[in-house]
Structures are given as structure tokens and as C-alpha cells.
């Protein structure tokens, strides 16, 4: 037999080529797995060529390392056939590992086919020598080489399948796996070479007319380095592009989540908004139908929030809403839905097997929300009115439940606020009436349906008249003359009272100017300020503008503020009243005796008169307690140098008693009913 030898440098180079080819194959397997459609096919074809060229190159580098004492060459046709076998086996391997699953039966069949393909590539490449006589193969070494090829292929397929998805340490893991696979491929090659025996006298039929060793060396090295380098460079560039795409996708996903959050949640409190609440309500209805469940809708409105907002500004109002939302969250279960509809309206969707479940929660919320808030160094107090609608008794649809819960909430407000109320069918009619009345009220200002009537104020006991109180009336086209008690509460609920109050102030100043021009220089006019109007940030400017607009001296205008309104936030009230007083406007504390005034604050208030509440006047002749209270109020007013006005005087006995106590002026039906301006002038002519 001819004695063969190996170039150790080329043997080492063949191992390096095998490892690089293995790493390229593993990387390509990952690319094919991540890609889809035509992109996946492109990676599969490119990966098959890169891996096939790598294995083929390793084989022929190993052949270059092999030498015999005779000239050697390689048949071009068989050499190309061996290359095709290597590429085909690689394509099959990549396709196999990119499947969703790789059961052991498929793995075994794939290992057998791929191992056979690699072995066929090897022995076809050996056949390209065209040895005469033919190469003699040792059966044991031949079988061992094929077995190694099959086992190595199985290991390569399993490793590639396991590493097809990326991880943080994927480069190191693939490098280790490529080392194992490269050693296995090289082991198969050199085991196959060990099986080959060349008889003495043999010669290479391809020498001189095939590819000689020199050209083969150049061809193999150039092709090997070019293909593997191109494959790895493309893979690295794609990996970077993929990383950037992944970052972009992550950013887009985060932005999408934020957009969904903004679309479905209130930006201030982070609670679900109306859109998400509607969806939750629909789901609750479907689940209730399916599972025969019951649930409740609680419609909550904050009492006094607008006054806080106007008095302290929107920033503090926003902080208050956030705190209210936190208090609600702390008192409900995780599975319950809390939504903010806007402004100071909240809706709760809760599971309620019995009405008592909803009542218990409503009572707890009313108590919790009415507790004081410490916000930006201010102590703020509000309350909550809650309406409750139960499914299915109070509504079968989302719209019905919301409408009925809202109607129950307004009923709770009508009952005194700071409480809750279950929906009753009778509320619907009232709700419709209130809605229509509100619609008409919004148009009343535009259509000049609001008018002022004037009630005389006279010096005790019988006059003369020293002024009037302006009282609002609504001349409704269908319902006739409507008194303030019927529509002002609705105006306060909706905030329309501020706009109405500004109109009253302007109209009163206009009328007072006409009376002054008519020679009644000793008259003044009193205008009531609602709680919302008093707390409104533009009140002082509104008063100043009305006076300037009608060229009215401030001393002819008296602003009446109820005791409870003035004392709601005494420090803030003091600032407002001092600004009005500095302007020259008279200040009257209305309904005095019904609130909770501190004598210290009362002394500091720049008021010019106290107005005794009519509730104390009604029972003067029969109730000694009321008489004692009125006597005390008169004495207090004298001590503070305030004028005392008694309203609601309807009998001569009341007139005489109040005069005897020392009231400065009187007002009531006995002395004159509220009347239009023309009628008032006629009565004093």
C-alpha cells in the first residue's frame, strides 16, 4: 500500500473551517426561524450554500492536507457533484430544524439522511481522484465513518434546533456548539480517510487533466473564506438591523400601550373613562345574563366641588379629584370598576347580590369622602351624592342603568346631599322634567325671559322706603312666572348660577341707575350672591364692571352673602369681602343665626349690616326661644356697629316687636311684596 501523510497546518485549518461552517449553520438556522415568507426562503437558500460550501471546503482542505508519493488531481464533474451533495444536505438540515417540532423519530430520520449525504459528499470527493486501481476501503473504518457522520448529523440537528431562538448569551452558546459540531465533522472526515487504502502502483487518473492541488488550494481557500465571511457579515448586519427593529418595535409597542391607556383612561386620575366604562358595563350585562348574576351601578357627584375649584383654582381642584379617586380605590374591591366621566362625576360598577351590598359601599364612600382634605396647606371639605341603579331591576341596558343611576343621584342631592339614594321609577319623570327645565333655563337668558322683581326695605317701623332687594323671577312661556326655588337649585347643580348671577348683578345696577336718574338718591339695591358666584374667581371684577358700565356709585349697591357661605372658608371669604368693601360696596350677612359664625370672624368681616333669617321671625309671637335669639342678634349687631335688617315681616305684631328690639329696617309682605320696577315706582308715588 502507498504510504500517506498529512500536513498538520492544513489539518488544523480544516478544523477551523469546520467550526466556522458549523457556527454559520447555527446562525443561519436562527435567521430562518425568525424570518417569514420569502425572507425565510432567502435565508434558507443562503444558509444552505454557506453551510454546504463550508462542509465541502473542510473536506477538500483535509484532502489538501493529505499527500501520497504520486501526483494528485481531482475530476471537475465529481468535485462539483460532491459540492451539490453538501449543499443539498445542508438545505435539508436547515429546513428540518426550522420546523415547529422535532420529535425523535424525525430527528433520527434526518440524522440518517443528512449523515448519508455528508458521507456521500466525502466519498464522491474521494472518487474525484480517479485512482487506478480503485481505492480499497476498510469495511470497519468505512462503517465507522458513516456512523460518525450520522451521529454528528443528529447532534448537529438537535443543537441547531435547540439554539434556533436567540438568548442573551447566544453567541457564546453557539460558539461552543460549533466547536463540538466542527470536531465531529472533522472526525468523520479523517475516519473516512483512515478507511482508504491505496495499492502499490496506483496512479491518479485525474492528475494532469483535472484540478491540480495548487488550483484546488486557491479555489477552496478563496471560496471558503468568501462564502463564510459574506454569510457572517450579512448575518451580523441583519442582527444589528434586527436589534434596531426590535428597539423600534418595543418603542412602538410602548407607545401603543400608552395610546390605549390615554384612550381608555382618565389622564388625571388614571381611572377608566366613559369609553372603558361602557365596555365594562356591556361585559357585566352579558356575564350577568350568562351566569344569572346581579350588579349595581353607583353614580357619584361631588357636592361643593365647583366652589372649591373656583375659590382655589383648577390646580387644587385637580389635586382634590386625585385624592377623591384614591379614597374610592381604597374602599372597593380589585374586581370592581371605578370610572371618572369628567368633572366631578364618578361611576362605580360593582357586583351586588343584594341591594344591601350596594348600600353598604355607598354609605362607606359618603362617610369617607366627607372627611376633610389637606391640600396645599388648605383644609377642604366636600361631600358626595350617590345614586344607585341595580341590574336587572332598574335597567336592562347600559344606557338605562346610567340614566337611572344619574336620576337617583340627583334625587339624593334634592334630599339634602351628602347621602345616597336607590333608583325608583317615579324619578324618571322628575328627571325628564328637570332635563327639560334645564334646557329651557339655558335659553331663558338669551330670550330675555329672566326678570327682576323688587321688594321694598323700609325704616322701622313704617318707612320711608330706603331701598329694595332684587329678587329673580322667570317668565316661562308655558309655565308662567316661576319662582327661584323651582329653578335656582338646578342652576347651582349645573354651574349656570354664575352666569345668571352676573346677569342679575348687571340688571340690578342698570335699574338702580334709572332710579337715581329719577330722583331717588337715597335708595340702595341689595343683590344676593349664591355660594358658587361668591366663590367664583371673577366676582370682584364682575361687580366693578357692572358699576362702571352703569356709572353707579358703589354705595348704592349692597351684596348679600349668607352666613353659611361666608363661613365655608372664612379666610378666603374675608379676602373677597375686603376687596368688595374697599370698592365701597355694602356687605350684608344674610340669613344670620342659621350658620356657625365665629364671633372672632364676624368681628373681622367688613359687613355693614346683619339680616335676620325669616325663620326666627315667623314664630316670634309664639316661641320665646326665637324671640331670645332675635334679641341677641340685635344686641350683637349694635355692639359691632352693624345695621339690623329683619326680613319676612308679615304681621303688625312682628313689626312692633322688631321695632321695639331695635331693628333698623324691615322687609316683608306686610310692607310690600316683590313687584316689577314700574309697579314699585307707582306704589311710592
From Swiss-Prot:
Q: Which GO terms describe its molecular function?
A: cyclic-guanylate-specific phosphodiesterase activity; diguanylate cyclase activity; metal ion binding
Keyword line? c-di-GMP, Cell inner membrane, Cell membrane, Hydrolase, Magnesium, Membrane, Metal-binding, Transferase, Transmembrane, Transmembrane helix
Instruction: Give me the residues that bind Mg(2+) 1, please.
Output: 469, 528, 560, 590
Q: Which gene encodes it?
A: mucR
* Reaction(s) the record says it catalyses: 2 GTP = 3',3'-c-di-GMP + 2 diphosphate; 3',3'-c-di-GMP + H2O = 5'-phosphoguanylyl(3'->5')guanosine + H(+)
| One Pfam family this sequence matches | EAL
One GO-annotated biological process of the protein: cellular response to nitric oxide
Q: Where in the cell is it found?
A: Cell inner membrane
Transmembrane stretches in the record are 9-29, 44-64, 77-97, 117-137, 141-161, 175-195, 214-234
Parts of the chain on the Cytoplasmic side: 235-685
The record lists Mg(2+) 2 as bound by 590-591, 647
Q: What does this protein do?
A: Displays both diguanylate cyclase (DGC) and c-di-GMP-specific phosphodiesterase (PDE) activity. Probably modulates DGC and PDE activities, and thus c-di-GMP levels, in a growth mode-dependent manner. May act as a PDE under planktonic growth conditions and as a DGC in biofilms. During biofilm formation, it specifically activates alginate biosynthesis via generation of a localized c-di-GMP pool in the vicinity of the alginate biosynthesis protein Alg44.
Q: What is known of its domains?
A: The GGDEF and EAL domains are required for the alginate stimulating activity.
GO CC term, one of those recorded? plasma membrane
Cofactor info, note text = Binds 2 Mg(2+) ions per subunit.
Q: How does it sit in the membrane?
A: Multi-pass membrane protein
Q: What happens when the gene is disrupted?
A: Deletion of the gene in the mucoid alginate-overproducing strain PDO300 results in a nonmucoid phenotype and an about 38-fold decrease in alginate production. Inactivation of the gene impairs biofilm dispersion in response to NO and glutamate. Deletion results in increased swimming motility. Loss of the gene does not influence swarming motility.
Q: What is this protein called?
A: Bifunctional diguanylate cyclase/cyclic di-GMP phosphodiesterase MucR
> What SUPFAM superfamilies does the annotation carry?
EAL domain-like, Nucleotide cyclase
Amino acid at each position: 500500500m502507498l504510504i500517506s501523510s498529512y500536513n498538520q497546518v492544513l489539518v488544523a485549518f480544516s478544523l477551523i473551517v469546520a467550526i466556522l461552517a458549523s457556527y454559520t449553520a447555527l446562525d443561519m438556522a436562527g435567521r430562518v426561524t425568525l424570518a417569514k415568507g420569502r425572507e425565510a426562503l432567502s435565508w434558507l437558500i443562503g444558509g444552505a450554500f454557506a453551510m454546504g460550501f463550508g462542509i465541502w471546503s473542510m473536506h477538500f482542505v483535509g484532502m489538501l492536507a493529505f499527500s501520497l508519493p504520486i501526483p494528485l488531481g481531482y475530476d471537475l464533474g465529481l468535485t462539483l457533484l460532491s459540492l451539490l451533495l453538501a449543499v443539498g444536505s445542508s438545505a435539508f438540515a436547515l429546513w428540518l430544524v426550522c420546523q415547529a417540532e422535532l420529535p425523535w423519530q424525525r430527528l433520527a430520520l434526518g440524522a440518517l439522511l443528512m449523515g448519508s449525504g455528508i458521507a456521500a459528499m466525502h466519498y464522491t470527493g474521494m472518487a474525484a481522484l480517479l485512482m487506478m486501481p480503485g481505492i480499497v476501503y476498510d469495511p470497519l473504518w468505512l462503517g465507522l465513518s458513516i456512523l460518525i457522520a450520522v451521529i454528528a448529523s443528529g447532534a448537529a440537528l438537535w443543537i441547531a434546533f435547540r439554539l434556533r431562538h436567540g438568548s442573551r448569551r447566544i453567541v457564546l452558546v453557539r460558539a461552543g456548539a460549533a466547536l463540538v459540531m466542527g470536531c465531529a465533522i472533522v472526525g468523520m472526515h479523517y475516519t473516512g480517510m483512515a478507511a482508504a487504502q491505496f495499492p502499490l502502483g496506483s496512479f491518479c487518473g485525474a492528475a494532469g487533466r483535472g484540478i491540480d492541488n495548487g488550483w484546488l488550494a486557491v479555489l477552496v481557500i478563496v471560496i471558503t473564506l468568501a462564502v463564510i465571511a459574506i454569510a457572517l457579515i450579512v448575518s451580523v448586519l441583519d442582527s444589528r438591523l434586527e436589534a434596531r427593529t426590535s428597539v423600534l418595535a418595543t418603542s412602538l409597542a410602548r407607545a401603543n400601550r400608552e395610546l390605549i391607556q390615554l384612550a381608555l383612561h382618565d389622564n388625571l386620575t388614571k381611572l377608566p373613562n366613559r369609553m372603558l366604562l361602557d365596555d365594562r358595563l356591556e361585559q357585566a350585562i352579558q356575564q350577568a345574563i350568562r351566569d344569572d348574576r346581579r350588579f349595581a351601578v353607583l353614580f357619584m357627584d361631588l357636592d361643593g366641588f365647583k366652589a372649591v375649584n373656583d375659590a382655589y383654582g383648577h390646580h387644587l381642584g385637580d389635586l382634590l379629584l386625585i385624592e377623591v379617586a384614591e379614597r374610592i380605590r381604597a374602599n372597593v374591591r380589585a374586581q370592581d370598576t371605578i370610572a371618572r366621566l369628567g368633572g366631578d362625576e364618578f361611576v362605580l360598577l360593582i357586583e351586588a347580590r343584594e341591594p344591601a351590598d350596594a348600600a353598604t359601599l355607598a354609605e362607606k364612600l359618603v362617610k369617607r369622602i366627607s372627611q376633610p382634605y389637606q391640600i396645599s396647606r388648605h383644609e377642604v371639605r366636600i361631600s358626595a351624592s350617590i345614586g344607585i341603579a341595580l341590574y336587572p331591576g332598574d335597567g336592562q341596558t347600559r344606557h338605562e342603568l346610567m340614566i337611572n343611576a344619574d336620576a337617583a343621584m340627583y334625587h339624593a342631592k334634592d334630599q339634602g346631599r351628602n347621602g345616597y339614594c336607590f333608583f325608583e321609577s317615579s324619578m324618571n319623570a322628575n328627571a325628564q322634567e328637570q332635563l327639560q327645565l334645564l334646557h329651557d333655563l339655558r335659553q331663558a337668558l338669551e330670550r330675555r325671559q329672566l326678570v327682576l322683581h323688587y321688594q321694598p326695605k323700609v325704616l322701622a317701623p313704617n318707612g320711608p322706603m330706603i331701598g329694595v332687594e332684587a329678587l329673580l323671577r322667570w317668565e316661562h312661556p308655558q309655565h308662567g312666572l316661576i319662582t327661584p326655588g323651582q329653578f335656582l337649585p338646578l342652576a347651582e347643580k349645573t354651574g349656570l348660577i354664575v352666569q345668571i348671577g352676573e346677569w342679575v348683578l348687571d340688571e340690578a345696577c342698570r335699574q338702580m341707575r334709572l332710579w337715581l336718574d329719577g330722583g331717588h338718591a337715597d335708595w340702595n339695591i341689595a343683590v344676593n350672591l349664591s355660594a358658587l358666584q361668591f366663590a367664583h374667581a371673577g366676582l370682584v371684577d364682575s361687580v366693578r364692571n357692572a358699576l362702571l358700565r352703569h356709572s353707579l356709585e358703589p354705595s348704592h349697591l349692597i351684596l348679600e352673602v349668607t352666613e353659611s357661605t361666608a363661613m365655608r372658608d372664612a379666610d378666603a371669604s374675608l379676602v373677597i369681602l375686603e376687596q368688595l368693601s374697599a370698592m365701597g360696596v355694602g356687605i350684608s350677612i344674610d340669613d344670620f343665626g342659621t350658620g356657625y359664625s365665629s364671633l372672632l370672624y364676624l368681628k373681622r368681616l367688613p359687613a355693614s349690616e346683619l339680616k335676620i333669617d325669616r325663620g326666627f321671625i315667623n314664630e316670634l309671637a309664639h316661641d320665646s326661644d326665637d324671640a331670645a335669639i332675635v334679641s341677641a342678634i340685635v344686641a350683637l349687631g349694635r355692639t359691632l356697629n352693624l345695621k339690623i335688617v329683619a326680613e319676612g315681616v308679615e304681621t303688625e305684631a312682628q313689626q312692633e316687636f322688631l321695632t321695639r328690639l331695635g331693628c333698623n329696617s324691615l322687609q316683608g309682605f306686610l310692607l310690600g311684596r316683590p313687584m316689577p320696577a314700574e309697579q314699585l315706582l307707582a306704589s311710592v308715588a
